[in-house]
Amino acid sequence: MAGLESQLVNRAVPLVSTRPTDAQRCRNKRRDFDTFINDKSFSNYIDDAYILLGKANFFNGNFFNAAEYFDYTIKNYKDNQSNYLTALNWKARSLMQLKRIAEANEILDTLDSILPKLKGKKLVSESFATLAQMNINLNNDTAAITLLKDAIKTSKQIQNKIRWTYILAQLYERTQNHQEAIRRYKEVQKSNAPFEMYFNAVLNRIRLIGPQNAGKNKQEQLLALLKDNKNFNYRDQVYFQIAESFAVDKEYDKAVENYNLSTTQTRDNQHQKGLSYLRLAELNFKHFRDYLTAKEYYDSTITILPKNSPEYNLILKKTLNLQYLTDRYELIALQDSLQEIARLPEELRMAKINSLINPVQIAKP
């Protein structure tokens, strides 16, 4: 389940946020830009307006329109190096969002070829970040790490550096370089990161370092996070990590208890809830050999996870196989019960049948 865990537990933060902004505000901005473009007195700034229109569409989720605006800028304003490079970056990002990877790669080849000629460090860092995003999409983690380090080194934007450092830590973790991952998570923890990123950096660092930190064991470190009111909305993730540590120690009953706590504490994080159900399903299937309970948890996992999740089809197939297994199990149990009844003496057999058909009613006092 490595692919699913990568998405649910340690979901990589996109190098460029695609979170939709206020829709009405974006529409108003686009109208302002359209008016601006049609006013010939501002002709020297039209390329800037096209860039802003492209970005407005991108952040509003209109990736096709965004790509068209950036493409127009690329074709018509090559003399403005800053806007030309910006348009290349953002067109590639738009195409990646549209899953048009081959076309995005062509843009990135152009971008890569002109990087050595660039002088502006801001432009260079953004280009490195775009190239890194493509390599992340293609699971080329080693190349992505190199490019991200270059992006961080050349950037002067503090929030970009923090964001990219967090992603770098995730990539180091994914490539099993836990020492570097811990170091980078610690950098994020000490920075002015947004709270959610800060919290996840702390959580991931604790998960990787194990029983350290002034003699406290991992469970104690994680439980300490629950005492801080700032972490109230993240209790599901904390309980999940506590359960994970118990599972590693083969304390499966305690693991089940905390996985269940994770599911009950989940508010809006359906990905986390899905992974907790998946863990419960796997434990019941592999360790407890309780296939009926495992089937129920697999059903819950499938209900929560979106169909485009990694390995969704694999989990669905396992669920269907378990359905067949549980059907056969129930049939065998029925046959065993019938054969047991058939072996009874006739007077006991009829009494047994009557007790099953008409359960004894306990008399009220």
Residue spans for each PLM region:
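Acidic, polar-rich low-complexity tracts and alpha-helical solenoid repeat scaffolds
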Residues: 1-365
